[in-house]
């Protein structure tokens, strides 16, 4: 066993003394059992994580029952909804790297035989997944699960995105103070990740198709008995996988990455999943070309439109058959998935999901009646995005195929929000928000406030927004993010000027400004060099090492230092 490194031999008597002091070893034979880390992310201020201590206790009990010894440790967590709109959002994406590094540190320092990961919200799941692939120790994931959808006094289904859009509507005077406060009190009624197809739930659904989580991981409610039983079954499965030496890199292959994007397309997942999945591919040593995403989109139908793109919540998806029903439907179309891949169940993706039929055709559409014949995400290329940009086409009004408008430029999120709120932004504008990428932000903050204000003011079809920053999974509208290279790295988004005509072509998947190559070159020579906004602390170190979104926003040590 891997853990023999710290518990076998006379020279490890001091280590054994310390292990006895933990109280985790109940019997003399326990030293001969596998040591299993529980990588938890319990934190009081994040509603998606307040219940994870209880879930970890269930996992501990089941791991012991299965014949192994559990040791729990914790990671940090950031709630993107609470961190939104201020310096806290600068720390959200960078927290992914801290989580990955912290988990790697504990796992490798103590030679665990397996790891039970309990994530839930936005950056925690991908951070833990980066650690799982990096350490390549037998692992399984079981998230905390989504919260129930809220309900307004008028009986309208609510999610957190409803609340963000209500801010814009309230500023416009289109909803009353009473209705506004009612929504605030009822949008998030239970613990769990936010109820729509936002980043947390997108990633937790993708864990199923990647093969590192059990079926229904992405949709079973946080407060359900099914979630607690899933924790138990995942613990039993992990101990079996330790015995059989099934490791993350046996499961995370290029085919698995392709299938993750296919499910993302079918469910209209968050654009952040592109960022995280590219980072995971990089960690697994897979050189993944962004162009593959468009190829996958072309052959993957859009089957389930979930909040914020509809009123359906994750619980509605669960009741309609969950991710297994969507996977089963996609498997009926040859070439869409790679169903004979290994998963943590010890079975193939096909064996896990075959025969799991759709129970509600309003929530999950069948192959013969998709929302769209192509997937809900697109990667755009052009003279504004030589290395790509991402748009959630599933969140764009279906009538919009091409949008051309005049640029109105802002060098920060806050400047843009102020201009939208004071009506400087008008119909026909393309709002350009730059210097908000991984390096420029720093931290690639989410642009949920400006997009929500645009939609809340009723301009969702009349104003577009492009940025080298990113979006919340709750974003909808004509919103193009992840533009690469970012402005801070000399990308052409930094060369746009007010009044330039910008065209977003969803049919041809292009993003262009109507300026010649010569003019853009002239502007680049006049550009002031980027200077880091933060000079001290973690964000300063992050700025010096992070790359643009087309790589997944990973941190790379310069080649001359390796």
Curated annotation (Swiss-Prot):
InterPro entries: Dihydro-acid_dehy_C, DihydroxyA_deHydtase, DiOHA_6PGluconate_deHydtase_CS, ILV_EDD_C, ILV_EDD_N, IlvD/EDD_N. Pfam families: ILV_EDD_C, ILVD_EDD_N. One of its GO terms (biological process) is L-valine biosynthetic process. Its EC number is 4.2.1.9. Binds 1 [2Fe-2S] cluster per subunit. This cluster acts as a Lewis acid cofactor. PROSITE patterns: ILVD_EDD_1, ILVD_EDD_2. Mg(2+) binds at residues 80, 122-123, 446. One of its GO terms (molecular function) is 2 iron, 2 sulfur cluster binding. The modification N6-carboxylysine is found at residue 123. Keywords: 2Fe-2S, Amino-acid biosynthesis, Branched-chain amino acid biosynthesis, Iron, Iron-sulfur, Lyase, Magnesium, Metal-binding. Its cofactor is [2Fe-2S] cluster; Mg(2+). Pathway: Amino-acid biosynthesis; L-isoleucine biosynthesis; L-isoleucine from 2-oxobutanoate: step 3/4; Amino-acid biosynthesis; L-valine biosynthesis; L-valine from pyruvate: step 3/4. The active site is at 472 (proton acceptor). Homodimer. Belongs to the IlvD/Edd family. PANTHER family: D-XYLONATE DEHYDRATASE, D-XYLONATE DEHYDRATASE YAGF-RELATED. This is Dihydroxy-acid dehydratase.
């Amino acid at each position: 066993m891997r853990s023999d490194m710290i518990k076998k031999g006379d020279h490890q008597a001091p280590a054994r003394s310390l292990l006895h002091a933990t109280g985790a070893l109940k019997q003399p034979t326990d030293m001969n059992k596998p040591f299993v880390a529980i990588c938890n992310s319990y934190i009081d201020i994040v509603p998606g994580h307040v219940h994870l201590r209880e879930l970890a206790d269930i996992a501990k009990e089941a791991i012991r029952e299965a014949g192994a010894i559990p040791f729990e440790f914790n990671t940090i967590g950031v709630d993107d909804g609470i961190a939104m709109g201020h310096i806290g959002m600068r720390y959200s994406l960078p927290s992914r790297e801290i989580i990955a590094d912290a988990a790697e540190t504990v796992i490798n320092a103590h030679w665990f035989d397996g790891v039970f990961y309990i994530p839930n919200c936005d950056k925690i799941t991908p951070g833990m997944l980066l650690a799982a692939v990096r350490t390549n120790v037998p692992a399984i994931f079981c998230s905390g699960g989504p919260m129930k959808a809220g309900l307004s006094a008028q009986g309208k289904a609510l999610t957190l995105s409803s609340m963000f859009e209500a801010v814009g509507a309230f500023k416009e005077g289109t909803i009353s103070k009473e209705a506004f406060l009612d929504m605030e009190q009822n949008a998030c009624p239970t613990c769990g990740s936010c109820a729509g197809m936002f980043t947390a739930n997108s990633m937790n659904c993708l864990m199923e198709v990647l093969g590192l989580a059990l079926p229904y991981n992405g949709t079973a409610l946080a407060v359900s008995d099914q979630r607690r039983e899933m924790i138990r079954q995942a613990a039993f499965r992990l101990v079996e996988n330790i015995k059989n030496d099934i490791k993350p890199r046996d499961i995370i292959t290029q085919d698995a990455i392709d299938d993750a994007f296919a499910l993302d397309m079918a469910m209209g997942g968050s654009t952040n999943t592109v960022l995280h999945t590219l980072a995971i591919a990089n960690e697994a040593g897979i050189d993944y070309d962004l162009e593959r995403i468009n190829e996958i989109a072309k052959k993957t139908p859009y089957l389930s439109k979930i909040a914020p793109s509809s009123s359906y919540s994750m619980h509605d998806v669960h009741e309609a058959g969950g991710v297994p029903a969507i996977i089963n439907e996609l498997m009926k179309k040859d070439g869409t998935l790679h169903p004979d891949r290994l998963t943590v169940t010890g079975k193939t993706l096909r064996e896990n999901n075959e025969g799991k039929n759709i129970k509600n055709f309003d929530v999950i559409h069948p192959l013969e009646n998709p929302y769209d014949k192509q997937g809900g995400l697109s990667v755009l290329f052009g003279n504004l995005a030589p290395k790509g940009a991402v748009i959630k086409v599933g969140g764009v009004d279906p009538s919009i195929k091409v949008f051309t408008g005049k640029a109105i430029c802002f060098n920060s999120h806050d400047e843009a929000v102020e201009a939208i709120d004071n009506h400087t932004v008008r119909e026909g504008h393309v709002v350009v928000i730059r210097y908000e990428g991984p390096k420029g932000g720093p931290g690639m903050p989410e642009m949920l406030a400006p997009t929500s204000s645009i939609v809340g003011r009723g301009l969702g079809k009349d104003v577009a927004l492009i940025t080298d920053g990113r979006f919340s999974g709750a974003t909808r509208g004509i919103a193009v993010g992840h533009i690469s290279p970012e402005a801070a790295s000399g990308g052409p988004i930094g060369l746009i000027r007010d009044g330039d005509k910008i065209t977003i072509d969803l049919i041809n998947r292009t993003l262009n400004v109507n300026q010649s190559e010569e003019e853009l070159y002239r502007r680049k020579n006049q550009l002031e060099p980027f200077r880091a906004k933060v000079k001290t602390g973690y964000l300063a170190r992050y700025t010096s090492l992070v790359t643009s979104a087309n790589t997944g926003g990973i941190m790379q040590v310069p080649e001359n230092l390796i």
